[in-house]
Regions:
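Ferredoxin-type iron-sulfur electron-transfer modules and their immediate structural context
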Residues: 1-157, 161-169, 177, 185-187, ...
Length: 199
């Protein structure tokens, strides 16, 4: 849709693309069809070389198209962008007990924890994230492999340690560290990270 519109040069149809990508009233992948269309709209803007729209103000998808349509223009930084409301706020660097916990009497996970972060609640182990120092001793000691390490895929893939967390728990790029390699983009399972194109 985006390529067809770009090659036709008729940018007036840009506002309709999110409705063509997400037709009807039922969402395809997220909790709301409106959220899906908003995300599709931001992806269209980035595909056209435009910047993300500020979340707190209402702007048209086509806003800024006049400047972006200039053939000799380079993209405006940043190249790699996070659509904030598309971010799923994946857990960041934490150990969690899964349903595989057998509540064994050995309680090796609890015994090896240097901070006393592992407790037993209703016969199953639980990790107090406020006390946990993420050493991984509990996970290594569990004979059932019931303790897993959760890390944001985008953050784990970033070799520059440029992915952080904003005040809402959403992923945020530190552009002073980011080299725009795209590893976060490739590894995000929710499609929240998008690079700019210059169609």
């Amino acid at each position: 849709e985006v390529a067809r519109m770009a090659y036709s040069g008729d940018y007036t149809q840009m506002e309709d693309i999110p409705f063509r990508i997400v037709p009807g009233t039922n969402p395809l992948h997220r909790e709301s069809v409106f959220l899906e269309r908003a995300i599709a709209g931001e992806r269209v803007r980035l595909a056209m070389g435009l910047s993300l729209q500020p979340v707190q103000t209402r702007t048209l998808l086509t806003e800024g198209m006049d400047q972006a349509a200039i053939a000799e223009q380079y993209y405006e930084a940043p190249l790699v962008n996070i659509i904030p409301y598309a971010c799923h706020a994946c857990p960041t660097k934490q150990y969690r007990v899964t349903e595989l916990c057998q509540g064994c009497l050995a309680a090796s996970c609890q015994r090896v924890c240097p901070k006393g972060a592992v407790k037993f609640v209703n016969g199953k182990s639980r990790i107090d994230q406020k006390l946990c120092i993420k050493c991984g001793k509990c996970a290594k000691s569990c004979p059932y492999h019931a303790i897993t390490y959760l890390e944001r895929p985008c953050q784990a893939a970033c070799g520059m340690d440029a992915i952080g967390v904003d005040e809402y728990g959403k992923a945020k790029i530190d552009y002073d560290l980011c080299v725009s390699c795209g590893q976060c983009l490739v590894n995000c399972p929710f499609g929240e990270i998008v690079d700019k194109s210059q169609i």
